[in-house]
UniProtKB/Swiss-Prot annotation:
The organism of origin for this protein: Euglena gracilis
Cofactor section: heme b; heme c
Name under which the protein is recorded: Cytochrome b6
Annotated NCBIfam families: PRK03735.1
Cofactor note: Binds 2 heme b groups non-covalently with two histidine residues as axial ligands. Binds one heme group covalently by a single cysteine link with no axial amino acid ligand. This heme was named heme ci.
Length: 215
């Protein structure tokens, strides 16, 4: 085993990377509330894992979506547990994200030179809420259907471009298969990709600039 490690160590300098990570200075004022961002990230990882597992059985069609969710809950081994963890983790992710944003704001973590870190954080907050909106519709039950109809109908009040935005979100004039397909694509591909990208940038900036000092 040591020979395998030595082979990778010689080429990648793993120990140097580990030493750099473990030796990063942590200010003395840091407390448990500074862990909220890390908890949010952990929830995201859980979401990716459980969501990926459910894609093997979920069918994004208006006729089969609800039945496939029912199948996951009642027939798939531990399917009820996987979906329940996905739902609980989603709620926890939103809660931790809100608390994290409040903590950063109240401790002045958005001030110079961390403005871009704050901006990427707000974008991540918007993406997190978008996960909730798109995921809520995927079972395509009565609650999900009417939630989508209301949410996608909100932009209609915008002058000139309102109707265009509504049709862009729904895929047609009314809510239907095109809407479910778009929300499924957003929830399982577009939003995770954007979130992972902005998280990487967010973490790199935190790593570069360090944790903000006390007020």
């Amino acid at each position: 085993m040591s020979r395998v490690y030595d082979w990778f160590e010689e080429r990648l300098e793993i120990q140097a990377i580990a030493d750099d990570v473990s030796s990063k200075y942590v200010p003395p004022h840091v407390n448990i509330f500074y862990c909220l961002g890390g908890i949010t990230f952990t929830c995201f990882i859980i979401q990716v894992a459980t969501g990926f597992a459910m894609t093997f059985y979920y069918r994004p069609t208006v006729t089969e979506a609800f039945l496939s969710v029912k199948y996951i809950m009642n027939e798939v081994n531990f399917g009820w547990l996987i979906r329940s963890i996905h739902r609980w983790s989603a709620s926890m992710m939103v809660l931790m994200m809100i608390l994290h944003v409040c903590r950063v704001y109240l401790t002045g973590g958005f001030k110079k030179p961390r403005e871009l870190t704050w901006v990427t954080g707000i974008i991540l907050a918007i993406l997190t809420v978008s996960f909730g909106v798109t995921g809520y519709s995927l079972p395509w039950d009565q609650v999900g259907y009417w939630a989508v109809k209301i949410v996608t109908g909100v932009p209609e009040a915008i002058p000139l471009i309102g109707n265009f935005i509504v049709e862009l979100l729904r895929g047609s004039v009314s809510v239907g298969q095109s809407t479910l397909t778009r929300f499924y694509s957003l929830h399982t591909f577009v939003l995770p990709l954007l979130t992972a990208t902005f998280m990487l940038g967010h973490f790199l900036m935190i790593r570069k600039q360090g944790i903000s000092g006390p007020l």
